[in-house]
């Protein structure tokens, strides 16, 4: 590569003709960390841990499929003439919002089958979701994707980024904004805020809705910086969906407080979640 800058090898392990890419390793690591955190949260809320494992078994494949369907829908101009590419997910092309939609629908159906509260289940997994997203963005980093507009090395150095990040943002002869990093850091901050909020008196379901609002707010602005956005006419799909989710989540919070009066929850000094009224 020109300018003496070499990108990181996206392949973690090479066994003969089989390549294990860092993207897959990072995503798998994110799932494992998310599961361990969700199991810890379930224990605090006195929920059967097997419920979390069972949910994950269903949610992972459904989320992958829904993430792919979401992407294909908004890139239909390409896929309508290349139908065989639809199933070739290893060529790239999944969307986090599609995965979240699939995960939420799975959780809703799962909670009804198991006869448990969807909102309680959603609160348990909310911290896991946002930290998994924070970790997962580093898979995009290794693939040199999900970046922003062209910039200069001087600008990136002005952000006091380590050289390995700056060098990885050198793509096809130009430097680009590390929007993957902006979103990852936004999600880490959101994770910390969720951990703080859960130690306050909060109503059931509002930890999850708070996660949706926080993530969507950050995604709206970061999406505006990206160069690979899925488009719906002249609009960036993720920005439109972010606004809708923010409004919907706030509306649900208001409606549930006024009409349903859900119970309060908070952590005690030992880290256990106790119910308040």
From Swiss-Prot:
One GO biological process term: lipoprotein biosynthetic process
Top-level taxon in the UniProt lineage: Bacteria
One Gene Ontology CC term in the entry: plasma membrane
Pathway: Protein modification; lipoprotein biosynthesis (diacylglyceryl transfer)
Binding positions for a 1,2-diacyl-sn-glycero-3-phospho-(1'-sn-glycerol) per the UniProt entry: 137
Molecular function via GO: phosphatidylglycerol-prolipoprotein diacylglyceryl transferase activity
Keyword Disulfide bond: no
Protein localization: Cell membrane
Keywords per UniProt: Cell membrane, Membrane, Transferase, Transmembrane, Transmembrane helix
Known EC number: 2.5.1.145
Chain ranges passing through the membrane: 18-38, 51-71, 89-109, 116-136, 177-197, 205-225, 235-255
EC main group: transferase
Location (main, coarse): membrane
Protein's membrane topology: Multi-pass membrane protein
Similarity comment: family membership: Belongs to the Lgt family.
HAMAP family xref list: Lgt
Stated role: Catalyzes the transfer of the diacylglyceryl group from phosphatidylglycerol to the sulfhydryl group of the N-terminal cysteine of a prolipoprotein, the first step in the formation of mature lipoproteins.
Protein name as catalogued: Phosphatidylglycerol--prolipoprotein diacylglyceryl transferase
Species assigned in the record: Listeria monocytogenes serotype 4a (strain HCC23)
């Amino acid at each position: 590569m020109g300018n003496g800058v070499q990108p990181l090898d996206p392949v973690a392990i090479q066994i003969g003709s089989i390549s294990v890419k860092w993207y897959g390793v990072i995503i798998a690591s994110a799932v494992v960390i998310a599961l361990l955190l969700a199991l810890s949260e379930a224990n605090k809320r006195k929920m059967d841990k097997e419920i979390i494992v069972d949910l994950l078994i269903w949610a992972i494949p459904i989320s992958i499929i829904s993430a792919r369907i979401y992407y294909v829908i908004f890139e239909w101009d390409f896929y309508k003439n290349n139908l065989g590419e639809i199933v070739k997910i290893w060529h790239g092309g999944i969307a986090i919002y599609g995965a979240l939609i699939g995960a939420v629908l799975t959780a809703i159906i799962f909670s009804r089958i198991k006869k448990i509260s969807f909102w309680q289940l959603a609160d348990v997994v909310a911290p896991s979701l946002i930290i998994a997203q924070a970790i997962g963005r580093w898979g995009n980093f290794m693939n040199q994707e999900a970046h922003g507009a062209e910039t200069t090395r001087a600008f990136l150095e002005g952000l006091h980024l380590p050289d390995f990040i700056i060098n990885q943002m050198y793509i096809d002869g130009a430097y680009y904004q590390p929007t993957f990093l902006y979103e990852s850091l936004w999600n880490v901050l959101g994770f910390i805020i969720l951990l703080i909020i859960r130690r306050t008196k909060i109503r059931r379901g509002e930890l999850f809705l708070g996660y949706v609002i926080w993530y969507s707010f950050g995604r709206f602005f970061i999406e505006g910086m990206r160069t690979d956005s899925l488009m719906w006419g002249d609009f960036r799909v993720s920005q439109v969906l972010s606004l809708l989710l923010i409004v919907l989540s706030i509306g649900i919070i208001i409606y549930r407080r006024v009409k349903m009066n859900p119970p309060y929850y908070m952590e005690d000094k030992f880290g256990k979640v106790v119910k308040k009224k």
